[in-house]
């Protein structure tokens, strides 16, 4: 039986509720492995994983590397600065070169939306999207979902408020797709200048007030203000942004008493979140990091083990 019929993980779009549940269940098993004294398995022994990062990353690249090594894979890291990359042709040339090395999986992070899908069309191995421009970041959404499910026991019928720089966030897009697929109620809270056009068509409720948007929320997911992606005046000032859209202890009171506080990292303390909240009892930010390794272990094992289990879809969805 083919439990996960996809060859690649390019995005959440294209995954069914069953696909997502399968990956989360598999990740739950990986958590147990990560908490053992002996963490290394031989599941992917003899297989090769190449991490190809065109954007600088610390936590995501380290998480993918650790995931592969805990499964026994041979892991190779390639960091390529965007200054030396001519998008498109160079990506294809790089793909051809790496494909000739016969890896089993390529993990790619790139500043251009669609880069992972393009790579998947050019190579014979599996491709995992570690973030492509403002498009998607599927493993982040999966690790967020795992964190929520382990804390709340479910994903359906919970209220999740995604707050901050939604416009520039691939994390927000992937989380919206996943949470909607799993039956959650999703809100976005942000100034109009930080919301993409047509956001309401994604099946979310839109709020411009933190107090209103957080009312009765089960989860408060803060997003980093991505000033490096801003070419114009999206916010009057950082100070004013924090005043209206930063999460501090007082603002958090609008949510449920047991609401989870999440952040994909890296955090801008004092910009979108106060230290008292980030380090407070409702924060599960550290748990998100732990779940990231487990989710990426689950994805690697699922894609590589499923290669010999029958036909799989080739679409960009997954």
Swiss-Prot record:
Sites where the protein binds carbamoyl phosphate: 59-60, 109, 137, 140, 265-266
Keyword terms, alphabetized: Pyrimidine biosynthesis, Transferase
Keyword Ligase applies: no
GO biological process, one term: amino acid metabolic process
EC identifiers of the protein: 2.1.3.2
One function term, GO molecular function aspect: amino acid binding
One Gene Ontology term, aspect cellular component: cytosol
Quaternary structure and interacting proteins, as annotated: Heterododecamer (2C3:3R2) of six catalytic PyrB chains organized as two trimers (C3), and six regulatory PyrI chains organized as three dimers (R2).
Functional description taken from the UniProt entry: Catalyzes the condensation of carbamoyl phosphate and aspartate to form carbamoyl aspartate and inorganic phosphate, the committed step in the de novo pyrimidine nucleotide biosynthesis pathway.
Family membership noted in the UniProt record: Belongs to the aspartate/ornithine carbamoyltransferase superfamily. ATCase family.
Database matches in PANTHER family: ASPARTATE CARBAMOYLTRANSFERASE (PTHR45753:SF6), ORNITHINE CARBAMOYLTRANSFERASE, MITOCHONDRIAL (PTHR45753)
Record's protein name: Aspartate carbamoyltransferase catalytic subunit
Organism per entry: Rhizobium rhizogenes (strain K84 / ATCC BAA-868)
Gene: pyrB
